């Protein structure tokens, strides 16, 4: 549930389904279908190139009352709608690609703080004072990216990186052994208050960080 709506990433059908009244009754059809022109279609990126209203592998959702974020892992990006959509429409916000038509997998080499390789999870947390933090599991780069505040369209890259020595590095377990500050294919995460939990799938463990 994000805000008052219940959202489901229907990954294999390349769409996100939304129920505006919260948890639906059994067999209740969705009120909103994002990523496809109708409830019967299921093509990757609507059968064409990536755009602001398409998905390849939508895998996770987060947000708040007036914002929905979707981790579109297959297009190596995070899409955002503000306010939350009440019908199929293009996204307003974009992270991980230079424009809405981009879906390039960054080549395996030195990386940056504003590109992803298969971001499978995203989480936005708001503190009692109204401040926000955003976390993205940049899965194939074996790292977690963090922003102080919700970045806007065209804003700079992440403020912090976990599990790598710098933004350019992306090795599995830092190309060393499994350690307390390494990750191998982080696949899920949850950010609440001062605690970040990460499903470190390649190392068969869950890692916890506490902000000090």
Feature names for model-found ranges:
Residues 142, 187-212:
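Blade-level signature of beta-propeller repeat domains, shared across WD40, Kelch, NHL, RCC1
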Residues 14-16, 76-78, 142-144, 204-206:
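Structural signal for beta-propeller blades
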Residues 12, 54-57, 74, 90, ...:
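Beta-rich catalytic cores
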Residues 5-8, 67-70, 133-136, 195-198:
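Conserved beta-propeller blade signature
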Residues 28-52, 90-113, 157-180:
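Surface-exposed loop and turn segments in beta-propeller and other repeat-based domains
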């Amino acid at each position: 549930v994000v805000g008052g709506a219940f959202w489901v990433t229907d990954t294999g059908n390349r769409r996100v389904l939304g129920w505006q009244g919260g948890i639906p009754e059994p067999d209740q059809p969705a009120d909103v279908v994002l990523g496809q022109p109708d409830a019967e279609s299921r093509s990757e990126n609507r059968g064409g190139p990536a755009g602001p209203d398409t998905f390849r592998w939508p895998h996770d959702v987060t947000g708040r009352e007036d914002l929905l974020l979707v981790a579109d892992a297959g297009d190596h990006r995070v899409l955002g709608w503000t306010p939350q959509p009440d019908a199929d429409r293009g996204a307003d916000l974009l992270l991980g690609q230079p424009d809405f038509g981009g879906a390039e997998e960054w080549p395996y080499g030195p990386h940056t703080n504003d590109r992803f390789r298969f971001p499978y999870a995203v989480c936005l947390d708001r503190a009692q004072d109204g401040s926000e933090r955003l976390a993205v599991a940049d899965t194939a780069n074996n790292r977690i990216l963090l922003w102080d505040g919700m970045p806007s369209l065209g804003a700079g890259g992440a403020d912090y990186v976990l599990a790598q020595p710098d933004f350019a590095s992306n090795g599995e377990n830092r190309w060393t052994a499994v350690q307390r500050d390494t990750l191998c294919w982080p696949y899920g995460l949850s950010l609440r208050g001062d605690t970040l939990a990460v499903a470190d799938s390649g190392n068969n463990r869950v890692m916890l960080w506490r902000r000090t």
